[in-house]
Amino acid sequence: MSGPSGRPTRAPRLGAGPLRVLQYGVHDTGYPRNVRVRAHLERQLGASVVVAPRSHAAGRLRRAIDDVRSLVRGARQADVVLLSEFRLSHAPLAWLVARLQGAALVVDGFVGQYETAVDDWRRVSPASPAALRFRVLDAAAVRCADLYLIDTEPRAAEIVRRHGPSAAVVPLAVGAPAWATRQPPAPPHDALRVLYYGGYIPLHGVDLVVDALTLIGARRRVEVVLVGDGPARRAVETRVRRAGLGDRCTFVDAVPEGELLAHIARADVVLGVFGSSAKARGVVANKVWQGLACGRTVVTQRSSALDDVRYAAGGLLVQTEPTSASSIADALVGAPLAHQAESPRDVAERLESVVQRSYDRFTDHLSALGPRREHP
């Protein structure tokens, strides 16, 4: 059996028959993270993966009861319970059910409760009881796991430092979706076309990008398209208008994922993340993978999480100094147009090899969880 990189993929050595996995807490079966994890288990490991149906009943209590029943029923036939990325608060329940059924618990910590509510969205104060509750839930998710998944080495190291878990913490790279393929450059043009897409969350640091555009001034003609919606969009629009950048910036409402490719194809540069939080300094955002896989220059802030990506992407990846608008401005002034960029023709394959190596490690750790129950 071989992965996308062409190297042999190791199957778990956990007993006879295919591995049986219950994927619990999936909020959206089309979300790229759980789609890729599920595909790896099914296509490369020959696992049987069942997604526990999510209740849509009226009333929170009714939904909770339905979800617990779904978890218990599914776990009876599972060797592994895989808790999906947006349900870390369910980790103690998933742990209890998995233990009662003799299954291992794998937790995908890709989206932490605290970092999302406190760092990303800033919905609650770090000193609030709600923030403390989120910290406790995140810690419980790590402690409950037999195997804990995250997306980058820096974030994995931080989890180990903070929680000291007995279970392995395995970075599982995000990677680019199948639709993100190399795009021919747009016909020659004069202005540098820059693309931002996302939800205007603090992680993205859009305010810093606006500051950078102000600093560029007359140094270069730059046109920016901003695709997406979010609570902060109106504030960004106001800031752009007050800075006199209205002729440089075009705001576009959110589009389906399938339409992003056309926006990327038209761009010379795709923007990554520029936020000031610890998470912003430790992630490789979806848009970074996607922009690079499409053969576009990606400008994003410097992070050790980008080390492997940097070697695969070559000159397409441009890193800026954290929290520095002037560094972003310099990067945009010096960025090549798409038809001038030195883009490795196999950049998507190189990036996929980086992802596959992380999934190979996941396979090894999954294999080490121990013998499974015999199939009935």
Language-model regions, residue ranges each:
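Nucleotide-activated donor-binding/catalytic signature segment of Leloir-type glycosyltransferases, i.e.
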Residues: 234-261
